[in-house]
């Protein structure tokens, strides 16, 4: 089936590989759906359809019966219109006994905003929306700190080796059996893992584990990290089809912020804001 268009503007894309899940909720076909998130494919469709999307902690939800992309990063999570429905569906996926969602005051929390990377090349409307939300949070008593964290940059660089190595390793036979059937920019992304050596992959994965531990030590005093879910709004479909270079550029930029949570093995939640396509991500 074809990728669905965006319900809020049919000239725009609706998200990543779980876009069908998000559009189904946005168009009221269901109250909730399930998506997969390896680098942002629950959170980007949720944000670009003004929905709530939860990227769960790696290995928390059983992946039996799913098609793997990158086993070290693959997760499943719910997409719904509000937090209550998301919480309910998450409990069903986890097979937990449902417990009533606790209510907290914003003033109970201490948030971190990481200055490096998350705001590079950000759309002005997305940036304004994020700053507006932060102003409201501070006004309501929350503590907010800004700081740079080097592990963010390190983890993203390392993931450029680990992601393609695993993805090509999982799908090489299907791709090379009929390469002409695959969208060229995506095929080349997969093939970028073709020549990564096993010892480089193992070393990079070990480095990533070390960066994760170091990162967690630095953020332990905070309740959550706040960031824009994506630095850009959904692009026009025709632009991406006609310009493969632009497709790759927009695809990588759209997923840049969300992939950080996957690389560092964080759970992450995107919430809709008052601005269309401008999700607020908590990690």
Model-derived regions, located:
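Short glycine/serine-rich loop segments
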Residues: 1-90, 262-274, 279-283
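Short, surface-exposed loop/helix-turn segments at secondary-structure junctions
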Residues: 4, 202-203, 234-255
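Conserved acidic residues
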Residues: 31, 223-225
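Gly/Ser-rich, acidic/histidine-flanked active-site/gating loops
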Residues: 75, 92-161, 182-183, 195
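Short helix-loop capping/hinge segments that flank enzyme active sites or metal/cofactor-binding pockets
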Residues: 108-110, 162-216, 228, 267-281
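Short glycine-rich anion-binding loops that position phosphate/pyrophosphate groups of nucleotides
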Residues: 117, 230-233
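Acyltransferase
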Residues: 124-148, 172-177, 201, 205-222
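Small-aliphatic-rich amphipathic alpha-helix that forms the alpha element of a beta-alpha
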Residues: 216, 248-272
